[in-house]
């Protein structure tokens, strides 16, 4: 039987898709596509979006298919749906901006890596991007009859607190979605060598969701001439809604501006 716990209400303004027009620098505009994570919403990237917009970037942040609605709607979506939505948003930004860079949180970071391979952005910044997870996703098919829904654990109280006004996402996911996430992780990891644009990885030493070597796997795998990492100390997986948000946005903005002026 499907668990019918109450679902979240996603009508809050912070959950709505982001579009903020930026300023031209030397006659050119730089667009930033923000991609949220698995079961999350664009609200998780709202503080970073606001900070990047203040830096002059045009910022776009969609809610990926099946997110910000119901867990059952999400269960009807595939990893291809999420990748195609990310591509469509990227193309929309390309039509009005001279440069387009991508920053993604968690699964959104994996999508950023796939876009780097296929769409050739100016730069990317994967944040808390999993190259492996602490969840046994490979068990999804076997355990589905017993556990049709997987519920997220309560955050560790030892970590930095999150800003609750931006913490909008599903409390869990239908088990069948686990395979879709594992597929995106596998696809993004398989062709890291095809990523040549500048890469800034953001990861917390305290991340409770992804494998600790994820940042190292990305940095070793990509072929980028410029690549680096911003390490956070005690931030949770969704670090973009903690008091580290400004620091993250500052580092990402500086990274994107560097790429803008050094693009071949």
Regions found by a protein language model. Name each.
Residues 48, 197, 211-220, 231:
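Short alpha-helix in the alpha/beta-hydrolase fold that links the catalytic acid
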Residues 49-71:
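Conserved alpha/beta-hydrolase
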Residues 70-101:
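Catalytic nucleophile-loop/oxyanion-hole region of alpha/beta-hydrolase
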Residues 104-108, 112:
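Gly/Ala-rich beta-loop-alpha elbow adjacent to hydrolase catalytic centers
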Residues 125-135:
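Active-site nucleophile loop of the alpha/beta-hydrolase fold
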Residues 195, 201-203, 207:
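Short beta-strand/loop motif that positions the catalytic acidic residue
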Residues 216, 220-238, 245:
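Catalytic histidine neighborhood in serine/cysteine hydrolases
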Residues 233-264:
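Catalytic active-site module of serine/aspartate enzymes centered on a nucleophile-bearing elbow/loop
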